[in-house]
Amino acid sequence: MHNYSVYGRRKLWKAARRAGIDAGRDQVARLMAAEGLRGASRAKKRFTTKADPAHVRAPDLVGRNFVADRPDALWVADFTYCSTWSGIVYVAFVVDVYSRRIVGWKAARSMTTALVLDALNMAAWTRRHAALDGLVCHNDAGSQYTSIAYTDRLDEIGAAPSIGTVADSYDNAMAESTNALFKTELHRNPAALAANGGPWKGLDDLEVATCGWVSWFNTERIHGELDDRTPAEVEAAYHRAHPRTEAA
């Protein structure tokens, strides 16, 4: 039962029950204590946002209300940085608010428009069979997200841009939460570092590990905000209940 060694006792108990293991919550807590295990704690956010005053900013269409009634109604996007032996690696994510699924991501050595644009393009490809008309894509006011290339691509896929403020985590809270989970569960996770054979060497090994973590995050990691289901399970349940919304 792989979980990157990040689950606390409640989530590990839930995961055990999902796996058919008949263990009580107190029993799980005792076993964790006996083995010296504890859940991962998230690190404090450090801001990487740099606004460009020359760029035209879209309005904030979200207003900190990160709620959606279906997949592909609202995406949030952001990027974070990771230290490695060979320098900083930046990782960008695009997250579907309804299911918390990471629909697009990209790792690169510089925080350019290409970084966030590639993550957006992956998201569009991931949802290539879905109708994206009516989609809102919310970001902070970083220059990468207000660039002409990025906003033009949003227009091409039928998404409306929404921009929060600079260096305010509440204005892009769900994206910030995903960044924090990534840093805690992969980049700074002792279990992940051990599996890597030591500290991250650079873009290549971190990129491969990120690919594995994103797959686990989407299909195996249970989320308390999703009633202890995975993003894939939440989307599958939606499409079973709304078969007509799926593209032919």
Task: Describe the predicted segments one by one.
Residues 1-248:
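Charged DNA-binding/catalytic regions of mobile-element recombinases
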